[in-house]
Amino acid sequence: MNPLIFPIIMLTIMLGTLIVMISSHWLMIWMGFEMNMLAVIPVLMKQYNPRSMEAATKYFLTQATASMLLMLAIVINLLHSGQWTFTKLMDPTASIIMTLALTMKLGLAPFHFWVPEVTQGVSLTSGLVLLTWQKLAPLSVLYTIAPVINSDLILTMSILSIMIGGWGGLNQTQLRKILAYSSIAHMGWMTSVLIFNPTMTLLNLLLYILMTSTTFALFMTVSTTTTLSLSHAWNKTPLITTSILIMMLSLGGLPPLTGFLPKWMIIQELTKNDNIILATLMAIAALLSLFFYMRLTYATSLTMFPTTNNMKIKWQFNKIKQMKCLSPLIILSTLTLPLAPAMMILN
């Protein structure tokens, strides 16, 4: 890609997201989504090969369908209310269609099929943009319309996403697909608490972006995309490989790591709102994600035979390019649990 074009494309992506987040006019929100979608496609095709082309096509078709549904919901709401701006009273049909459109953009179950395929087909940098920045615009609109969202629909999709996010990752060897299924599960956790405490959804999103960005940055540092290459990186970069495995456990929600904090707060909030059965189901479904993360950690670090040349630690390590912000990111992504009392007071 031309170095002069890339900053313009990234600026358009950010501008599209910001338009969605700050607008109160439905047409401007739809335009922001379209700007964002059309600008992110060249980013997905940055590595020009058939797999990235296929991934970009799948992304375009899914997002175009979601945009069509969103416009349909906007028109139905316009016929019902007579105005283009946000209103507290929204037509129930428009609310359901809009929720379906936004969850399709997010990648919630049962509209999750595109997320692993697209993430696997693109580079690590494009995957990072797809699984972090691209979640901001749909979640900001869901946050705004939270009072009128159909609770049965969003809670059903949430629990389904958490279960599929766990089941889907069980037999994966590709790290990008594992992170894609992790994203589906995390989106399920975020949307489950949306109708009870929207602020907690934003806090969960912040922690999710922090952990996912750190994990992708570590993958980029050692240039690893599969579990096999991760285990082979052990003797070259033991510290970074250890950090990757700890980050995986944090994403799975193992206490006392940072990833446990949002799950703990969401379960507490659901219990407070007399949704004990839902909270129990979500906690059980979260064990699926934690299981495959722990299995990956065990297989990579604890089952290596110590005398093979492939696994011996080298005396002199290869010099690798390290990001200066990596150390604070790792600390924040693993050791934020002591801040739980302050975060609970804020909520």
Swiss-Prot record:
Cross-referenced PANTHER family: NADH-UBIQUINONE OXIDOREDUCTASE CHAIN 2 (PTHR46552:SF1)
Protein name (record): NADH-ubiquinone oxidoreductase chain 2
Transmembrane parts of this sequence: 3-23, 25-45, 59-79, 96-116, 122-142, 145-165, 178-198, 202-222, 240-260, 276-296, 326-346
Subcellular location: Mitochondrion inner membrane
GO molecular function, one term: NADH dehydrogenase (ubiquinone) activity
SS bond partners: none
EC number of the protein: 7.1.1.2
Quaternary context: Core subunit of respiratory chain NADH dehydrogenase (Complex I) which is composed of 45 different subunits. Interacts with TMEM242.
Catalyzed reactions per annotation: a ubiquinone + NADH + 5 H(+)(in) = a ubiquinol + NAD(+) + 4 H(+)(out)
Purpose: Core subunit of the mitochondrial membrane respiratory chain NADH dehydrogenase (Complex I) which catalyzes electron transfer from NADH through the respiratory chain, using ubiquinone as an electron acceptor. Essential for the catalytic activity and assembly of complex I.
Family named by the database record: Belongs to the complex I subunit 2 family.
Native organism: Peropteryx macrotis
